[in-house]
From Swiss-Prot:
<protein>
    <recommendedName>
        <fullName>Large ribosomal subunit protein eL20x</fullName>
    </recommendedName>
</protein>
<dbReference type="GO" id="GO:0003729">
    <property type="term" value="F:mRNA binding"/>
</dbReference>
<dbReference type="InterPro" id="IPR028877">
    <property type="entry name" value="Ribosomal_eL20"/>
</dbReference>
<dbReference type="GO" id="GO:0005829">
    <property type="term" value="C:cytosol"/>
</dbReference>
<comment type="similarity">
    <text>Belongs to the eukaryotic ribosomal protein eL20 family.</text>
</comment>
<dbReference type="GO" id="GO:0006412">
    <property type="term" value="P:translation"/>
</dbReference>
<dbReference type="InterPro" id="IPR023573">
    <property type="entry name" value="Ribosomal_eL20_dom"/>
</dbReference>
<keyword id="KW-0689">Ribosomal protein</keyword>
<dbReference type="GO" id="GO:0009506">
    <property type="term" value="C:plasmodesma"/>
</dbReference>
<dbReference type="InterPro" id="IPR021138">
    <property type="entry name" value="Ribosomal_eL20_eukaryotes"/>
</dbReference>
<dbReference type="GO" id="GO:0022626">
    <property type="term" value="C:cytosolic ribosome"/>
</dbReference>
<keyword id="KW-0687">Ribonucleoprotein</keyword>
<dbReference type="GO" id="GO:0022625">
    <property type="term" value="C:cytosolic large ribosomal subunit"/>
</dbReference>
<dbReference type="GO" id="GO:0003735">
    <property type="term" value="F:structural constituent of ribosome"/>
</dbReference>
<dbReference type="Pfam" id="PF01775">
    <property type="entry name" value="Ribosomal_L18A"/>
</dbReference>
Amino acid sequence: MGGFRFHQYQVVGRALPTENDEHPKIYRMKLWGRNEVCAKSKFWYFMRKLKKVKKSNGQMLAINEIFEKNPTTIKNYGIWLRYQSRTGYHNMYKEYRDTTLNGGVEQMYTEMASRHRVRFPCIQIIKTATVPAKLCKREITKQFHNSKIKFPLVFRKVRPPSRKLKTTYKASKPNLFM
């Protein structure tokens, strides 16, 4: 739905059944990736780190892409993340305004790459949530909550009323600023 670079997937997996544990615990994660292969890879990365289950002795049960319920209404999204920089690991909370969560996550990845030089593999999204307007913390998202917001027109190009009056060269330079 939309031309997003990152898609949200729900990945379900577990360790392979053994004689000791015939019904291993099933784990479900919501992850972002460019495609299903990247989402599976990220799932096994976290399983290896958190639960000591590797892909070689694990089993993938299901993978589904998650789509937005209302992709035309604008919402505030809060993203809790952990990232690895040159000096260590850091926790962070970010807020974005977008129509879909995928759009907000893409904004987050772009901002982290530009401001902190942190690329996709070094970022771990801990949690995401739709934040109501009264609970927003960041000024950059709060500024759009004003119902009487105005965007001033600071640059106007005066166009000729007809094609006949259009000229290549002007006698005087036009003043474009108001």
